[in-house]
């Protein structure tokens, strides 16, 4: 732990968990899809759902999906910017079993139909943890370069490598 963990990240507020962490969750979702999504279905769990609109959690996640950093001054306008960019957004409460209270479940769809479903939690101070990708357990923060490989588990695939 260092002084920046205590002070919190440089960000557009009001909350390091509900705004900065949420923006990072959206950004990681974008990176896992590989490009800006055309459609985003965003489920907010626990305190994300209870106070998300007031803390700008919805706007922060969408800002991350648009490629914005947690300190981007455009975050408060991200829902309008998403509309202008052709990104269809749906935000709703969701109940997730045994999940951290600041968890988002996003299903992101690209313009050519590629999808990725990401569950991630905001841990405080702008820190996040990715919990699952397409239903498979994961545990990484995105602070360091992380390689995610998708493969087909069927006979003969390894011989093609």
Regions found by a protein language model. Name each.
Residues 66-112:
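Contiguous domain-boundary segments centered on the initiation and propagation of an alpha-helix
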Residues 1-11, 40-43:
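Short, hydrophobic/aliphatic alpha-helical segments
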């Amino acid at each position: 732990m260092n002084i920046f963990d205590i002070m919190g990240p440089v960000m557009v507020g009001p909350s390091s968990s509900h705004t900065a962490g949420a923006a990072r969750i959206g950004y990681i979702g974008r990176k896992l899809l590989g490009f800006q999504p055309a459609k985003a279905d965003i489920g907010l769990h626990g305190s994300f759902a209870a106070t998300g609109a007031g803390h700008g959690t919805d706007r922060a996640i969408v800002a991350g999906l648009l490629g914005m950093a947690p300190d981007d001054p455009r975050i408060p306008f991200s829902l309008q910017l998403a509309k202008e960019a052709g990104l269809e957004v749906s935000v709703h409460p969701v109940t997730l079993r045994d999940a951290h209270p600041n968890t988002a479940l996003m299903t992101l769809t690209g313009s050519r139909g590629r999808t990725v479903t990401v569950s991630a939690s905001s841990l405080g101070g702008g820190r996040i943890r990715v919990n699952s990708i397409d239903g498979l357990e994961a545990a990484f923060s995105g602070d360091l370069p992380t390689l995610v490989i998708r493969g087909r588990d069927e006979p003969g695939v390894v011989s093609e490598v």
